[in-house]
Every structure is written in structure tokens, then in C-alpha cells.
Design a protein with these regions (language model features):
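C-terminal folded domains that constitute the principal catalytic or ligand-binding module
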Residues: 142, 150-153, 157-258
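Cysteine protease catalytic domains with a Cys-His-Asp triad
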Residues: 1-131, 139-143, 155
Length: 259
């Protein structure tokens, strides 16, 4: 409900080379680009969403664009739970587990000071995500985040084109004018886990989306440092996971239906 995932063809269609000139159409390039994708959001108001996921392919390389809080006009500071609340939640979760499960987990944990073990675990997680944030207040801000597993730096045009798209979409959808400038919706390159080869960019894009949905960012103090968001081993088995999912769906579709 809070998110919308665009098709992997959306950005390609938005940025498709324009062969017509302004004198032929009577409109600016931003309006002509929006015209090409205007029907892609006819059933959804993207400004009612907190997060917009846009897969981007540039020169055979995939990366993720995440537009956050597009309806906000300025950053907001809101209250967040404190560290004691997090500990209390974890304590409550432990109480609700079956005793046998708790004993099994206890026997599998390394021996040592429990507080140090918990501290070590939380230290490895980004401190801006829902599972590890211990701040009293957090920052929600309208922004365009880029998660690139190759840490490339040619994204300025991406920020510009998407700001223009949002501006025209707002005008068409809301019937009023609003500026989506660099000051009102900041662009930022996130520090994320990086690939160690030349072929896994698509897998990392999928993992960025999955990790955000499972352990979303809650404090948008830029730039986001998500280096420890997930281990590289998690991406290495992603192809096998996808293969098993495809085979599962295939079996479900080919099984004879009960009459």
C-alpha cells in the first residue's frame, strides 16, 4: 500500500530518444517524455505512496532508483522509538516464543556475554533501518535515492529527468503547479553493498528492493550508509532462489486442476 514498483521498461520508455522537435508538438521535452508514459500510472496516484521503486538500465548495467515521500514539500522530524523500547520489544518477542524454540536458539548461540553478542549483531546493521534504529527522532525527507552496485557517478541526468517527470505528473494529476527542484527533492547516491564481478548488477537490484521491503530505511539523514545491509553470500544464492521460484510457479500452472 505504501509502495509502488514501476515496470523495468518504464525508465527506458521515459527516456526514449525523441525525434520530434518542439515546433512540431508545441510542448517542452519534459511534457513529451511524460506523454510517453502518462498511462503507466492511470490506476495509481504515485503521490499517495511513500516509496517508488524504479529499475534503471543504462548501457547494459542495472541499478535502482528509489523516490521517497514524493508528496512531502520539506523534510520532517518525527518521533521514533528509543533503544529501551527496542530491547523491550525483543524481550516481549522472546516471551511469546515456545519454550522449546527458545531453548534451541539458546543452545545454538555462541557462549559469552549476551550483551556483547547483541551489541555485535546490532553493530553490523545500518543504524538508519527499522530493525536497528535507536534514535529518539528520525528524519523523513523527499529524496531520490540511487542504489548502484558499481558505485558509478553518471546519475545527474537521472535525477533531472525524474524531477521533471514528477513535476509534470503532479500538474496532470493534481491540477496545480509545484516545483520539484534539487532543493525540494534531493538526489543522493547511497552507500550499499557492491558487486565483485561484472554480471550481478541485476541480482543486486533485486536484493536492494527485497532488503528495503524487509528492513526499510526509517531515518533519511543523507547520505545513507547501508554498506552492511546484507551479506554478499545472500546475493550469490539469488539465482538459485529465482530458479526454484520459476519452477514452483511452473508446476502450479501445469498441475491438473481438481474437478
Amino acid at each position: 500500500e505504501r509502495s509502488h514498483i514501476f515496470s523495468s521498461f518504464f525508465y527506458k520508455q521515459l527516456t526514449r530518444k525523441d525525434t520530434s522537435g518542439p515546433e512540431e508538438t508545441g510542448s517542452t521535452s519534459a511534457y513529451r517524455r511524460h506523454q510517453r508514459v502518462r498511462t503507466w500510472t492511470r490506476h495509481v496516484d504515485i503521490f499517495s505512496k511513500d516509496y517508488l521503486f524504479i529499475p534503471v538500465n543504462h548501457e547494459a548495467h542495472w541499478y535502482l532508483v528509489l523516490i521517497c515521500f514524493p508528496a512531502l514539500e520539506r523534510p520532517q522530524i518525527v518521533e521514533w522509538r528509543q533503544k529501551s523500547s527496542v530491547s523491550q520489544d525483543e524481550s516481549q518477542t522472546t516471551k511469546e516464543r515456545p519454550s522449546g524454540e527458545s531453548q534451541r536458539e539458546s543452545s545454538q548461540q555462541p557462549k559469552g556475554n549476551p550483551s556483547k553478542i547483541n551489541e555485535s549483531r546490532s553493530h553490523n546493521l545500518p543504524d538508519c533501518t527499522v530493525h536497528s534504529c535507536t534514535k529518539e527522532t528520525i528524519c523523513k525527507r523527499p529524496c531520490i535515492l540511487i542504489m548502484d552496485s558499481l558505485k558509478l557517478s553518471y546519475h545527474q541526468r537521472t535525477y533531472t529527468l525524474l524531477r521533471e517527470y514528477l513535476q509534470v505528473e503532479w500538474e496532470v494529476r493534481k491540477g496545480s503547479c509545484r516545483s520539484f527542484s534539487n532543493e525540494s527533492i534531493t538526489g543522493s547516491l547511497c552507500r550499499v553493498p557492491l558487486q565483485d564481478n561484472s554480471s550481478d548488477c541485476g541480482l543486486y537490484l533485486l536484493q536492494y528492493v527485497e532488503s528495503f521491503l524487509q528492513n526499510p530505511v526509517v531515518d533519511f539523514a543523507l547520505p545513507l550508509r547501508l554498506d552492511q545491509w546484507f551479506p554478499r553470500s545472500q546475493v550469490r544464492k539469488k539465482r538459485e532462489d529465482l530458479r526454484e521460484l520459476v519452477l514452483l510457479l511452473y508446476r502450479r500452472q501445469t498441475e491438473p486442476r481438481a474437478t
